[in-house]
C-alpha cells in the first residue's frame, strides 16, 4: 500500500489507473537500469515509489503521441 504520493494525487497527473501503473512500472525499470533521477531528493527507496514521486511532481508524463497508437 502506498502512502505517498497518494493515488488521488497521482490520478490528477494521469487519466487512468492502468496508465498510471504502466507509466510508473516503465519508469521504475528505467531507474533500475541506471537512468538518471529526475528529482534531487526522494522519500522512497524503491524505484517504483521513486517513479510515482516523479509522476506526482509533474516531471514524468505520458507522451500524447504514444496514446494515439491504439
From Swiss-Prot:
Q: Does Nucleotidyltransferase show up as a keyword for this record?
A: yes
* Superkingdom, natural source: Bacteria
Annotated Gene Ontology cellular component terms:
DNA-directed RNA polymerase complex
Q: Which GO terms describe its biological process?
A: DNA-templated transcription
Gene3D superfamilies, alphabetized: 3.90.940.10
Q: Which reaction does it catalyse?
A: RNA(n) + a ribonucleoside 5'-triphosphate = RNA(n+1) + diphosphate
Q: Which GO terms describe its molecular function?
A: DNA binding; DNA-directed RNA polymerase activity
Indicate the quaternary assembly: The RNAP catalytic core consists of 2 alpha, 1 beta, 1 beta' and 1 omega subunit. When a sigma factor is associated with the core the holoenzyme is formed, which can initiate transcription.
Could you tell me what this protein is called?
Answer: DNA-directed RNA polymerase subunit omega
Task: Please report the organism this UniProt entry assigns to the protein.
Answer: Lactiplantibacillus plantarum (strain ATCC BAA-793 / NCIMB 8826 / WCFS1)
* Organism lineage string: Bacteria, Bacillati, Bacillota, Bacilli, Lactobacillales
Please name the gene that encodes this protein: rpoZ
Amino acid at each position: 500500500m502506498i502512502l505517498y504520493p497518494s493515488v488521488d494525487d497521482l490520478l490528477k497527473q494521469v487519466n487512468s489507473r492502468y496508465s498510471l501503473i504502466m507509466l510508473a512500472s516503465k519508469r521504475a525499470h528505467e531507474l533500475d537500469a541506471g537512468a538518471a533521477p529526475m528529482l534531487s531528493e526522494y522519500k522512497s527507496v524503491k524505484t517504483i515509489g521513486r517513479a510515482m514521486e516523479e509522476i506526482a511532481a509533474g516531471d514524468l508524463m505520458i507522451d500524447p503521441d504514444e496514446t494515439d497508437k491504439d
